[in-house]
Amino acid sequence: MDVDIREENNSVVLFFYQMHTQDRSYPTFSSLDLGPVALLNKTDKKISDVEAYETGKNSEEMKRQMSKSNEVEAILYKTNDPTLIARTYFFYLHSDAAVPQEKAGSVEQYSLFYSQPNLGIWQYGNEWFVTHEFDKLLTANNFEFVGYNGKHHVYARRSDYLTLAISGGEYADVNNGKAVMQITVLYKPTVFAGSKEQRLAKVERMLKQYNPKK
């Protein structure tokens, strides 16, 4: 069981998340490949650079989501890889007053979708949990477990605050609606600040969604 403790109005609030024993061993990746990190949060990398990267990978653009101000908000690509089957990019917008203008059009975060979820997560009921094998690979690459909020397992790296939000689910536009593992990649400089509950809430607020669930 995972327990988070928070003081609120002179009272102690406990948050309980049931953790389960892994049912068996699962194979995982031979190495940790987090995709186009070089495109992430870079002021000199814009939508055209993402398009060029995906063209070089022979990917197919599936959908493009526009904002109310008619800016490109997100793009979904289908890859030709049978395991890493899709990537979705989310971009900083000119219309967002909180965004420095030099970042507008740059990649704020991206999500990787895997057709074999058990390479990193396993399912218990309606919940997905990171496998011991994938956790070992993540920690070997200097990622620390930040916490679990019932939906996302969050890991982050102290050296540069690269943050991963790992989840499982079914999406209408990905893998023909079959279950996938989703890893959302972003930078969050304050990811280790505050209580565990506060850290998870900050990451959750940042996460973008593009593909509706089935």
Question: What spans do the regions from the language model cover?
Answer:
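A charged, solvent-exposed segment within the mature domains of Sec-exported extracytoplasmic proteins
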Residues: 17, 126-202
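Short helix/turn-capping signatures at newly exposed starts of structured segments
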Residues: 1, 7-132, 195, 200-214
